[in-house]
From Swiss-Prot:
Disulfide bridge map: none
Database matches in PROSITE patterns: RAB
Protein's name in the database: Ras-related protein Rab-2B
Gene3D superfamilies: P-loop containing nucleotide triphosphate hydrolases
Gene Ontology MF: a single term: GTP binding
The organism of origin for this protein: Dictyostelium discoideum (Social amoeba)
Protein modification: This sequence lacks the C-terminal cysteine motifs subject to isoprenylation in other Rab proteins.
Motif (Effector region): 53-61
GO cellular component: Golgi apparatus; Golgi membrane; lipid droplet; pathogen-containing vacuole
Amino acid sequence: MCNCGSSGEKPTFNDRKSTSYEHLFKYIMVGDSAVGKSNLLLQFVDKRFAPNSDFTIGVEFGSRSININDKQIKLQIWDTAGQEKFRSITRAYYRGAVCAMIVYDITRRDSFESLNSWLTDCRKFSSCDVTTVLIGNKADLEANRQVSTSEAKEFAEKNGLMFFETSAKTALNVDEAFEKSTEQILKKLESNPGLLSNEGNN
């Protein structure tokens, strides 16, 4: 794990290295503070949830290898801080990313209303071929929902995004979001072999 400018006790992520892999895909996770980005990463990489995790300061890193269509793919995932004061740091990590996950909290309307700003950054600072995924996190808190599934789905369709509602706590759709987006990247790679010319670079 790499912590850039971090302070305080943070969850640690295992780097599940395989002896070999066919591709290295760089992912970046963005979105407002406290929407659950760090716990999504923790759940995907370590299969656990940290209910009292601190806000991300700067950038955190985790990786995991998965098998898609008989291909071993290593995902290198960068979890970025959501605070405005770290926005310039976050923007630097779009470079070389083949997937951007934009995360909001289904129980916080304000985090959904920030999506246009995050999407603008994504389109400005990442490759035009980047696969973009909209993640509505904290789906386990249905009673506190402030953003309907249909509204989020409409936003995703309007902007050409993949869409999943997830729960980092229960693991709902966490693996699916990474696996399905990886499948989409592999499809793009078939028609554009140069897509990964900068794979894994910051």
